Amino acid sequence: MANGAEDVVFCRGTGQSDDSDIWDDTALIKAYDKAVASFKNALKGEDGATPQENDNPGKKRKNNKKNKSRKRCNAAPDKEWQVGDSCYAFWSEDGNLYTATITSVDQEKGTCVVFYTDYGNEEEQNLSDLLTEPPDMDEDALKTANVKETESSTEESDRSFTPQKSGHAKHKSKSNFPMGPPSWFPSFPPGPPPPPPHFKKMDGRRGEGPGPSFPGWPPMIPLGPPMIPPPPPMSPDFGEDDEALGSMLISWYMSGYHTGYYMGLRQGRKEAAASKKSHRK
């Protein structure tokens, strides 16, 4: 170690390291510049095509106006429109064709008031502008009309289905409810019969239990033991040994209480079984 202390292990910047080409990111920079240049060229191409696209809507609008004028020229001039007739009219705000119904006609002025069926609006139209059928309806207007017809048909079907559905619901509700209390809980037996006239009360010791047991029925199981009487009080002057002794006595007391309660339950069941056998005899 002392002899090689002055030897040079690595010198930064000499380029003699085997992994010196790792820090050469020239290819990465060229790829990035190429991608940015292609993206800019694409943006320039879109900007050059934008004015042409902006010119197209104007031409389309002119074509739409020409088509609308042609449609209006296609209207039948000899038709005598009357109140209640169905027709197609162009709405003044958007210029689209919609289904309408004539509500009033003014033959002197050559105008009428139409009620747009799908939207509920009213507007005054010239009788010459009304159409009996849409000859060359625009795609957007045709889609709108189809959507409205579909919605109206679905609403009618829903209305027609509603009473039937309610009838089925009523039928189901009637069938789901039981006819009487016995069918609510089929797994439980019915209530006990009234006691016979010759039934005698239990003695005082048994009367303190959960309740009388009827003949032919098993004894009723109590819900739980009554309140446990409090343990005897302890003096606060007890030491550690006295505390341990007191804890032991309390545990014996509680154990004896629960043991007596359990034995009492067993004795009560035996007496109930014996009385049941005697009644059968």
Swiss-Prot record:
Reproduce the free-text note on domains from the UniProt record.
Answer: The Tudor domain mediates association with dimethylarginines, which are common in snRNP proteins.
Q: What is this protein called?
A: Survival motor neuron protein 1
**A GO MF term:** RNA binding
Q: Region labeled Required for interaction with SYNCRIP — which residues?
A: 264-279
Known InterPro entries for this protein?
A: Smn1, SMN_C, SMN_G2-BD, SMN_Tudor, Tudor, Tudor_SMN_eumet
Q: Does the keyword Nucleus apply?
A: yes
Q: Which family does it belong to?
A: Belongs to the SMN family.
For the region Disordered, give the residue spans. 1-20, 42-77, 145-242
Task: Cite a GO CC annotation.
Answer: protein-containing complex
**Native species:** Danio rerio (Zebrafish)
